[in-house]
Amino acid sequence: GCLGEGEKCADWSGPSCCDGFYCSCRSMPYCRCRNNS
């Protein structure tokens, strides 16, 4: 499965964000999937 909006993600390991989302690490200490539109 993939990660959706607001779910915790990691650039270096899976699972990755779903299509249409990217892993944003701006809101430390966690990275979260955000909509890339």
Curated annotation (Swiss-Prot):
The modification Serine amide is found at S37. Keywords: Amidation, Disulfide bond, Ion channel impairing toxin, Knottin, Neurotoxin, Secreted, Toxin, Voltage-gated sodium channel impairing toxin. Belongs to the neurotoxin 07 (Beta/delta-agtx) family. 02 (aga-3) subfamily. Could be considered as a biological insecticide candidate, when fused to Galanthus nivalis agglutinin (GNA), a protein with the potential to cross the insect gut. This chimeric Pl1a/GNA variant shows a gain in toxicity against insects when administered orally, while maintaining similar effects as the wild-type toxin when injected. Transport of Pl1a/GNA variant from gut contents to the hemolymph of cabbage moth larvae, and binding to the nerve cord, has been shown. The keyword Disulfide bond applies. It is found in: Secreted. The keyword Secreted applies. InterPro entries: Beta/delta-agatoxin_fam. It comes from Pireneitega luctuosa (Tangled nest spider). Expressed by the venom gland. It comes from the Eukaryota. Binds at site 4 of sodium channels (Nav) and inhibits the fast inactivation of cockroach channels. This toxin is active only on insects. Has a potent activity against S.litura larvae. This is Delta-amaurobitoxin-Pl1a. One of its GO terms (cellular component) is extracellular region. The presence of a 'disulfide through disulfide knot' structurally defines this protein as a knottin. Disulfide bonds join C2-C18, C9-C23, C17-C33, C25-C31. One of its GO terms (molecular function) is sodium channel inhibitor activity. Its main location: secreted. The record marks K8, W12, Y22, S24, R26, M28, Y30, R32, R34 as: Pharmacophore.
